[in-house]
């Protein structure tokens, strides 16, 4: 019998990303993300925000669950969730810096998403798993497919 590599001796910690997301949503919902998003990304309302965040939350939770059940097979899913929160943080921080106004969500993005995402990447790095081969798919799935491309496509489509 071949011994499988240990990717993570505490795979349940990946669910912290779901907690990070929930706290981030509280900041966004409480401090006017929809109104801010309407100005920056065009034609944005509460229904779209709730549907979009529900879809994102389900995808992140499923990625975390898959990783939890089988970290070896679904390392890419755990890494994708981590890349997703880092990409979201990048958008909030850059929008605040470039727009010169508070982007609802930037506080949790800066103080929870960035350290949280880096925490997981560092855990994988210490196990020798943070290789170019291992991060290409998670970067494209988590950062590009689920965050950056839809955000910029929406802004271009609505001429925001």
Predicted regions and their residues:
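Membrane-interface loop-to-helix entry segments
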Residues: 45-58, 101-115
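Interfacial loop at the N-terminal end of multi-pass membrane proteins
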Residues: 26, 30-51
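Membrane-interface helix caps and helix-loop-helix hairpins in membrane proteins
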Residues: 71, 93-104, 158
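Membrane-interfacial loop-to-transmembrane alpha-helix junctions, especially the N-terminal start
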Residues: 10-17, 73-81, 131-136
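Core segments of transmembrane alpha-helices
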Residues: 52-66, 85-89, 113
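Juxtamembrane boundary at the C-terminal end of a transmembrane helix
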Residues: 148-160
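Hydrophobic alpha-helical membrane segments
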Residues: 80-92, 105-123
């Amino acid at each position: 019998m071949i011994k499988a590599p240990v990717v993570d001796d505490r795979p349940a910690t990946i669910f912290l990303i779901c907690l990070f997301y929930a706290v981030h949503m509280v900041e966004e919902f409480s401090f006017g993300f929809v109104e801010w998003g309407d100005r920056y990304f065009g034609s944005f309302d509460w229904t779209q925000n709730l549907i979009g965040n529900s879809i994102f939350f389900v995808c992140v939770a499923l990625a975390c669950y898959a990783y939890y059940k089988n970290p070896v097979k679904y390392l890419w899913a755990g890494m994708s969730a981590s890349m997703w929160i880092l990409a979201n943080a990048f958008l909030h921080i850059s929008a605040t810096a470039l727009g010169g106004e508070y982007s609802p969500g930037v506080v949790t993005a800066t103080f929870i998403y960035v350290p949280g995402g880096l925490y997981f990447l560092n855990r994988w790095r210490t196990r020798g798993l943070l290789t170019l081969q291992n991060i290409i798919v998670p970067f494209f799935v988590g950062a590009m497919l689920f965050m950056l491309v839809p955000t910029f496509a929406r802004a271009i489509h609505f001429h925001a």
